Regions:
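Charged, solvent-exposed interaction patches on well-folded alpha/beta domains
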Residues: 3-171
Length: 171
């Protein structure tokens, strides 16, 4: 229950208004009961009452749910430009962002403001198709990406391995 209002009306009536939380995401490690509403506020509820499979999982330090919710809303349309969705968004205790896409790609976004993180992600999304096509892959083949580097990024693709100096394959 988000808010309950009780008013007395003349002559002998009582008007009760109940506002419920509308869950938009699951929160933290305890996704069985913790959820986030449209204002970024964490609340407790029974996850069985909603379709939890359709909700993203957000996590971060205590008291940072509003910031995480705002970043989710900022990153979601950026990823949508390449037909990717956000399954999970995490803010580490040290302030570093990590997103898991609906294709199970884990992208390390690093620290910074929304604009800084968003700019790194946009540069990555503009160039990743060129990189993946060199290996006859698509952007859905991205297994992991690390965007914390100053002038580039590290990328791991499904089905692509490297050879070490000894000729043995390395994942």
């Amino acid at each position: 229950m988000r808010k309950a209002t009780v008013r007395r009306e003349f002559p002998n009536r009582i008007r009760v208004r109940l506002d419920e939380h509308q869950p938009v995401a699951l929160w933290g490690e305890n996704t069985e009961t913790s959820m986030v509403n449209q204002d970024g506020v964490v609340f407790e509820a029974n996850v069985d009452d909603i379709d939890a499979d359709q909700l993203p999982v957000l996590s971060g330090p205590a008291g940072q749910s509003v910031l995480v919710w705002q970043m989710y809303n900022y990153l979601k349309p950026i990823l949508a430009t390449v037909s990717m969705g956000v399954d999970k968004l995490e803010l580490s205790p040290r302030g570093s962002w990590r997103v898991q896409t609906d294709s199970d790609a884990m992208i390390e976004l690093g620290r910074g403001t929304q604009e800084e993180v968003g700019q790194r992600l946009q540069v990555f999304l503009k160039t990743v198709a060129q990189v993946t096509s060199r290996y006859q892959r698509t952007t859905n083949s991205v297994l992991a990406a690390d965007l914390r580097h100053t002038n580039g990024y590290a990328l791991r693709l499904r089905g692509v391995t490297t050879l070490g100096n000894d000729g043995n394959k390395k994942p």
